[in-house]
Every structure is written in structure tokens, then in C-alpha cells.
């Protein structure tokens, strides 16, 4: 494709047809109907970037890195969005000691009732449901006055709901990504600072057993000084396009059609960023370059699986099947970030972290280094039998404490339960969250930055500093006991 053709194609995607997102709803894990016809923000290829400077902190606002809220004996939790993802959180939150589910909001009454049924079965108490439109969560906030809200609507609603619940007095815990634009991320950061409420993007992968163990190994210096990381979200999800009226595919498909970059970066990036202490005293995000492959798979899938006049076959899919980005940190370290939700290939998040003394990698779990095994770093230590001594020595204390129960509870191998458990534990003990609002903003900002870079032929994009320089004062995430 020549440059002029590529440019025309890009410019054609700048607008989203009115009502294109109207199929969205609170119904799915990350799903809500829009307030009004709303456009997905697509960067102008002639613009130098989304934001290369940052606004000053507002009067009365405080830096939230390491913030400790007053202890809560019992945490009253409400939910906005209880579809596939939100309902999973409901089932697990209902059994966590010290948490009480006090309200459930969703556009679909049947799905709200389904989650209320789960809570009643597990606890004997039935929470009220709120299903009178997309802003009924505000009525819920006024009536039940929750301490914390789990925010699981569609991406277009993350910013609005998250900011509203903080302004109405609750800590906010929002599904990934935190928001879809740099502007929205700044709004969330500012609201958290002004209200002095926690806002944590719920990156569950940081609580996986492998990820926790690698964090423990990195903190103990097993692989020396960190140099390089590889992160990814490789997950074939074309089948979601069959969710035409309700479900993730009913709204997410439009993102594949109208954007071109890494639209879902945080699952792979979150753990790598915390291994490296990015935005925590040692180092920070610097700049990013990004490239996308041709966009072929979604159109081919639509043609094969839907009638010729189906709405999916009327879309001109812009998002490359594979996006590859490289992040350069302020210390000069590099991170590869890949994204592909279209190609027929096995699932992977890569999860590779390389240091001066060795390398830890995922998919499959394998390690090599001067301090590992017999020191033969020319071969991986992999497989259940060979890795057993590694897990025995370096398993994270948090996983040792919670892991067995988490495995019984399920949720992506237990990581979901560990995450929710830690949220409640931190709120009850008045501890800082394991992931602060700035980390969620940095990790999520890769999406729009990658779109700008792709649109400009791979030109570098500077990360906004959501901490306004205060990352240098933020302690690295320790090894939680």
C-alpha cells in the first residue's frame, strides 16, 4: 500500500458513525451504552503527539503515589457493570472477609439480578440493583454510599464513571484499560488527586503466580541489573464478533475498525513495568515507537462468518492484526510490547525480563542465569520437575499465603482473587495500593501513543509524566508478605 493510500485510509477512520457504539451496554465485563453518539478519538497523523507537556497540579490536590486512606473495618463495595467480567468479580468479592456488596448497577435488569442472586446465595444478603439507565450508578452512589466501586463498563465509559464515583466519595477500581485517551487519563489522575481517593486500574496479571515469583526474584537481585523486557497480549478473540447485540464484541469490534495501534497493552506491560520500577523512584517511561501490520484478519473473519449485508462486513477495518511497539525508559532500558487479538496462534503475554545475570521468561515458564540451577545459562530451566526448586525457593510470600485459596476460587488461575483480596486488605489496613493511579495511566497511555506513532510512520512519541515529576519520590513496590 503506497503512502497516499495509507493516509487516505487513516483519515477515513477519523469519525465513527453515529450510533456505532450504541450497541454497547453495562452488560459485559467492560461494557456500557454511551450517553450519546460518541466518536472514538483517532489521532491526527499531522499532529506531533497527544501531549508533550503536562498541566500543573490543581490547588488543594495532592500527589497520590504511596497514598494511605483511613482504615476501613468493613469495605462497602458497589459494582457498575456486571456482565462477563463484572459478574466474575461479584462472585469472588462476595466471599472476601471484610467486604460487603451493597449495590449492583447494570443496564440489563436480568444480568443485575443474576449477580444479586449470586451475592444472596453466598452471603444471605441481597444487594439492591440499579437498572434505570446508563447514569443510574449516580442514584446507587447516593442511596447506598459505598466505600469502593468496581467499575466494569465499556472502555468509552471508564473515565466518566471512575471520575464520578470518586467525586461522590468512593475509591475507584476500574477494569483495563484505565481509559482510551491521554486526555481522559489526565482527568482521572486529577480527580484522584483532588478527591484524595484511590483509583487503581485492576491489572490482574500482576497477581499471577509466575509474575509474583519473578517480581520476588528481581527484588532479590537474582538476574542482576535489569536491561530489557518483553510484554504482549496475544489472544485470538475473533469469536467475540459473534456478540452482536450484547457482549464485548458488540462494542469492541468498532475499536478494531476505527483505530490502529495497540488497543489493549496493559496485561503484558503491567508486570514488566513493576519489575523495572517504572514510575517508582528508579526509572520512568520515556518515549515509544510503534508499527502495525496490515489489517486483514478481521475482515476475512467477517466475510467468512457473517452475511454480506451484515454490519461487520460494512466496516473498513483499520487496526493492524499485529502491533509492535518499543518503549525507551529514562534510564535507557527498552521494553518490547506486542498486541494481536486476531491471528490464529497460541495465547501469550511473553513476560520476559532480562538482566545482567540472567533472564526470566513466560509462555512457557522458563529461567536461565548465572545464579540459577548449575549456572548453565545456555539452556533454559523449564518443565515442572526442573522448575520445582525455583518455585520452592522464590515463590512470592503473597502467593504462598493466598495462592491455595485463589486456585480454588479460580479467575485466570487465581490472579483475579488475589487482586481483589489485596484491594480489600489494603483498604482495611490503610495501606497504599499495589498499583497506583499513575501506573494505570502510564500503562494505558501506550494505546493512544501507539496510534500516533503508527499514523506518523513510527515516529517517537513522548510519554506524558502523569506524576508531574513525583515518580522520583515513590517507593518501589515491595514484596508484600
Swiss-Prot record:
Coiled coil: none annotated. Substrate binds at residues 233, 252, 264-267, 347. NAD(+) binds at residues 84-85, 106, 155-158, 175-176, 204, 264. Pfam families: GFO_IDH_MocA (PF01408), Glyco_hydro_109_C (PF21252). Keywords: Glycosidase, Hydrolase, NAD, Signal. Residues 1-29 form the signal peptide. Binds 1 NAD(+) per subunit. The NAD(+) cannot dissociate. One of its GO terms (molecular function) is hydrolase activity, acting on glycosyl bonds. Its cofactor is NAD(+). It is an enzyme of class 3 (hydrolase). Belongs to the Gfo/Idh/MocA family. Glycosyl hydrolase 109 subfamily. Glycosidase. This is Glycosyl hydrolase family 109 protein 1.
Amino acid at each position: 500500500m503506497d503512502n497516499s493510500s495509507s493516509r487516505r485510509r487513516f483519515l477515513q477512520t477519523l469519525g465513527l458513525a453515529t450510533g456505532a457504539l450504541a450497541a454497547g451496554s453495562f452488560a459485559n465485563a467492560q461494557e456500557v451504552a454511551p450517553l450519546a453518539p460518541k466518536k472514538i478519538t483517532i489521532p491526527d497523523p499531522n499532529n506531533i503527539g497527544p501531549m508533550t507537556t503536562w498541566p500543573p497540579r490543581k490547588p488543594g490536590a495532592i500527589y497520590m503515589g504511596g497514598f494511605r486512606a483511613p482504615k476501613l473495618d468493613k469495605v462497602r463495595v458497589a459494582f457498575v457493570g456486571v456482565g462477563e467480567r463484572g459478574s466474575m468479580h461479584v462472585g469472588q468479592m462476595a466471599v472476601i472477609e471484610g467486604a460487603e456488596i451493597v449495590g449492583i448497577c447494570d443496564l440489563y435488569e436480568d444480568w443485575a439480578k443474576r449477580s444479586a442472586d449470586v451475592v444472596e446465595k453466598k452471603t444471605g444478603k441481597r444487594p439492591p440493583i440499579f437498572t434505570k439507565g446508563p447514569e443510574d450508578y449516580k442514584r446507587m452512589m447516593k442511596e447506598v454510599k459505598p466505600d469502593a466501586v468496581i467499575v466494569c463498563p465499556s472502555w468509552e465509559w471508564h473515565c466518566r464513571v471512575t471520575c464520578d464515583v470518586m467525586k461522590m466519595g468512593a475509591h475507584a477500581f476500574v477494569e483495563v484499560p484505565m481509559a482510551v485517551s491521554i486526555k481522559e487519563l489526565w482527568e482521572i489522575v486529577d480527580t484522584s488527586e483532588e478527591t484524595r481517593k484511590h483509583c487503581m486500574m485492576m491489572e490482574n496479571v500482576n497477581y499471577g503466580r509466575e509474575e509474583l515469583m519473578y517480581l520476588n526474584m528481581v527484588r532479590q537481585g537474582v538476574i542482576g541489573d535489569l536491561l530489557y523486557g518483553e510484554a504482549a497480549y496475544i489472544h485470538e478473540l475473533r469469536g467475540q464478533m459473534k456478540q452482536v447485540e450484547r457482549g464485548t464484541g458488540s462494542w469492541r469490534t468498532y475499536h478494531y475498525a476505527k483505530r490502529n495501534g495497540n488497543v489493549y497493552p496493559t496485561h503484558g506491560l503491567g508486570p514488566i513495568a513493576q519489575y523495572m520500577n517504572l514510575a517508582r523512584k528508579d526509572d520512568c517511561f520515556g518515549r515509544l515507537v510503534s508499527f502495525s501490520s496490515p489489517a486483514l484478519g478481521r475482515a476475512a473473519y467477517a466475510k467468512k462468518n457473517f452475511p454480506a449485508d451484515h454490519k461487520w462486513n460494512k466496516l473498513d477495518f483499520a487496526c493492524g492484526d499485529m502491533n509492535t511497539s518499543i518503549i525507551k525508559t529514562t534510564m535507557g532500558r527498552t521494553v518490547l510490547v506486542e498486541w494481536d487479538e486476531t491471528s490464529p496462534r497460541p495465547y501469550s503475554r511473553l513476560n520476559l525480563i532480562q538482566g545482567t545475570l540472567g533472564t526470566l521468561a513466560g509462555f512457557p515458564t522458563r529461567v536461565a542465569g548465572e545464579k540459577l540451577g548449575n549456572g548453565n545459562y545456555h539452556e533454559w530451566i523449564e518443565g515442572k520437575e526442573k522448575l520445582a526448586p525455583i518455585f520452592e525457593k522464590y515463590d512470592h510470600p503473597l502467593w504462598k499465603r493466598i495462592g491455595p485459596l485463589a486456585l480454588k476460587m479460580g479467575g485466570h488461575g487465581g490472579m483475579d482473587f488475589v487482586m481483589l483480596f489485596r484491594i480489600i486488605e489494603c483498604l482495611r489496613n490503610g495501606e497504599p495500593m499495589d498499583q497506583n493511579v499513575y501506573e494505570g495511566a502510564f500503562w494505558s497511555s501506550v494505546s493512544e501513543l501507539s496510534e500516533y506513532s503508527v499514523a506518523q510512520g513510527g515516529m517517537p512519541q513522548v510519554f506524558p509524566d502523569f506524576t508531574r515529576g513525583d515518580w522520583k519520590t515513590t517507593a518501589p513496590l515491595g514484596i508484600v508478605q
